[in-house]
Regions:
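Acidic, low-complexity Ser/Thr/Gly/Pro-rich repeat segments typical of extracellular/periplasmic
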Residues: 2-20, 24-238
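Extracytoplasmic/secreted envelope proteins and their assembly/folding machinery
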Residues: 66, 111-113, 127, 158, ...
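Conserved beta-strand and immediately adjacent loop positions that scaffold enzyme active sites
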Residues: 76, 113, 174, 250, ...
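Short amphipathic beta-strand/extended segments with alternating polar/hydrophobic composition
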Residues: 90, 188, 258-267, 370
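Gly/Pro-biased beta-strand-loop elements
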Residues: 139, 223-326
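Exported/periplasmic cell-wall-interacting domains
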Residues: 153, 261, 276-279, 295-389
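Structured segments of extracytoplasmic/periplasmic soluble domains
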Residues: 160, 164, 168, 290, ...
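Short, glycine/acidic-rich beta->alpha junctions
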Residues: 195, 243-246, 339-344
């Protein structure tokens, strides 16, 4: 906070002479009045003040610049950057206060020039310069989903930073979620570089979501500041949920709460718990018409499979595996993925949205919570505990 204030007062020769006359009231050396009585006091000159003060350093970029006048009205105020470009501002209705309405830049010098007319009818001017804070570093911030995306009902809002955030509470306070339908949700930090917002329950279908991350000017910690504010607006699509109870060898797809499709599948190998398809609620993260799979530990490299929908950063996909057709619908023999017949894999691929939930039950392997997309793998109370507020 800038403590110093600058006050400029007109030093007008005529005004000085008038004040001298008023103080002495005219007359002889004894101070006796002559003529028709005391001389009337001159109208006061305008007094202009500005904040930040002249020569102020490290001014916060979110602090508005204000220019005020007492004993008069402002006739002109200009605030310019080092390139001479004017900064937008607004004059109050009574013409006594000017306030900037444009955000200032980091590590910039600004100059203000103000003119006012006092009650004495005479002009007064004020000129000064100040400089804004210089970040130790600037941080790129990204938002997902992106503008105009249509996503599934389990899709979280994800805010990622290119460096660690220390002042997490300050960041959360600057993040705003607006929805077309009332939705209860919470922010939760998955790491020092990522904070997500997820609803308590799956999003209502067809909800419009607006995210406003007003982060510019907020100290993330250690003098690191975001480069800019970021925003996004996206839509939640139809309600579609994949449910797989691994012992059943079936992948059921529900739409709007009713069974939509049922596909025979082969899940992670039952005989090796490390290859089980892990329990938990995941989301479709990516969709690839053709994907290359490599895992030399388990004896395969450069294997091409079609219609691959990733649902975990642990390495699990829903994809076709025609080579495993003999076991699909009969036995769990995969390396952790959900294997489908090619036609079924294509059919599901075409129906899926990024953000669709995938619910896995019946496995001996518990949820893998090391992923940066693990929002639905913890209870609601555990998720709320990840908030910094």
């Amino acid at each position: 906070v800038i403590e110093r204030r600058t006050v400029f007062k007109a030093a007008l020769a005529a005004g000085a002479a008038t004040m001298a006359a008023a103080c002495t009231s005219g007359g002889d050396d004894g101070g006796a009045q002559t003529g028709g009585g005391a001389t009337a006091e001159a109208p006061p000159a305008a007094v202009i003040t500005a904040e930040p003060a002249a020569d102020a350093k490290n001014v916060p970029v979110l602090q508005p610049v204000t220019v005020k006048v007492a004993k008069g009205t402002l006739t002109e105020v200009k605030l310019t950057n080092a390139d001479g470009k004017a900064v937008e501002g607004k004059l109050s209705d009574d013409k006594t206060t000017w306030t900037s309405s444009e955000t200032l830049g980091y590590d910039k010098t600004y100059t203000y020039n103000a003119t006012a007319t006092g009650t004495d009818g005479k002009p007064v001017t004020l000129t000064g310069s100040f400089s804004t804070l210089k970040p130790a570093s600037t941080v790129r911030v990204t938002l997902n989903p992106t503008d105009d995306a249509t996503v599934g009902v389990a899709m979280p809002v994800s805010v990622k930073f290119t460096s660690a955030v220390k002042n997490k509470a300050a960041v959360e306070r600057a993040l705003k979620i607006e929805t077309s339908t009332d939705v209860e949700g919470s922010w939760g930090w998955l790491s020092d570089q990522q904070v997500d917002w997820r609803p308590k329950e799956y999003w209502p279908a067809n909800t419009t979501v607006k995210v406003d991350a007003k982060l510019y000017g907020i100290d993330l910690g250690g003098g690191a500041y975001p480069r800019a504010d970021v925003t996004t607006e996206f839509k939640i699509g139809r309600n579609q949920v994949v449910k797989i109870h691994t012992p059943d060898h079936k992948m059921n797809v529900y739409r709007g709460g009713s069974l939509y499709k049922s596909y025979p599948c082969s899940n992670g190998k039952d005989s090796d718990v490390n290859l089980n398809t892990p329990n938990g609620t995941y989301i479709i993260m990516t969709k690839e018409p053709s994907a290359i799979f490599d895992n030399a530990r388990y004896g395969y490299t450069n294997v091409n499979k079609k219609w691959a929908c990733r649902f975990s950063n642990h390495g699990e996909f829903i994809h076709e595996n025609q080579d495993n057709a003999a076991n699909i619908g009969r036995a769990n023999t995969s390396h952790g993925c959900v294997n489908l017949l090619e036609a079924d894999a294509k059919n599901y691929f075409d129906s899926a949205l990024i953000g669709d939930p995938v619910e896995i039950t019946g496995s001996r392997l518990g949820p893998v919570v090391t992923s940066d997309v693990m929002d639905w793998l913890v209870s609601w109370s555990a998720w709320q505990a990840k908030s910094a507020l």
